[in-house]
Amino acid sequence: MIHKHSDSVFWFDLMPRGEKKFISVYMIVDEKVALIETGPASSNSNLLEGIEAMGLSLGDINYVIPTHIHLDHFGGGGHIMDLCQNAKAVVHPKAYTHVSAVERWWEGSRDFLGGIAELYGKPRPISESRLISADDGYTLSLGQSSLSALHTPGHAPHHITWIYGDEAFVGDSAGLWYSNLNVSFPVTPGYYRHDLALDSIDRMSSLDLKFLHYTHFGPRLAEGALDQVKSEFEFWMGTVTEGYEKALSSEEIVEILFGARSGLEQTDMSHGIHQTATHLGSVEGMLNWLRRKDA
């Protein structure tokens, strides 16, 4: 089902392995057409169905644009680029070499994700001739409208939040959005940088935004949202810091968070293998940041 957010912004539920409300894919339709996020390689057929449901052909796609290149966001980038011969992919400069030569990217993903990486599937390389490197502030004209790159590291060093007028495609820079709970929780992998994550949230907060478009999952009204996001990140880091100082395990710390945040434990089981232990992984990412600070 295609959701029409506005005259130019559309989105659909990718449903990887049948999991609903896990990955949103967005499309901007102007004189040029931009596809924002592709999902993993294993969901390429679902992505093609979504594009077809939009009434578009693969030749209509001009730009394929990830917020960052984690497998659940852009593992299928090379697969769809092989089919969209008129398209160019727009990526962070730090992602450029990884998407043109995927072996390091793939091996790093397998090391971090284990079996989930295999479920997502191996990415395919994209020729450098079809890549655009987007520095901070880079603007891409789509005709009557444009997208601007706001570098938002923290979750990943190669993360971009794409600004579209008073809307932002936030990827994972503002956590995971659970509309049923009206809250976003952090998602902080092993190389998480808490200082940069908070700076990125502040950069987004300085803009007069009306909507945040989450990959996980769906649009969120921006009013008050980033204040909630920053407060939640700070609460989690405070809880993790207390646990770190007491030499608690990551499992013990996540249980404290489950007790402190209504609905949090249930979200850990809401998307099968895709979501399992996500919050434990976030605690471990925060612990790793604290350890690096102390090193």
Regions found by a protein language model. Name each.
Residues 1-54, 162-172:
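Conserved beta-strand hairpin/beta-sheet module of binuclear metal-dependent hydrolase folds
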Residues 74-84, 101-102, 223:
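Metal-dependent catalytic neighborhoods of phosphoester/phosphodiester hydrolases
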Residues 8, 28, 37, 47, ...:
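Divalent metal-coordination and catalytic microenvironments
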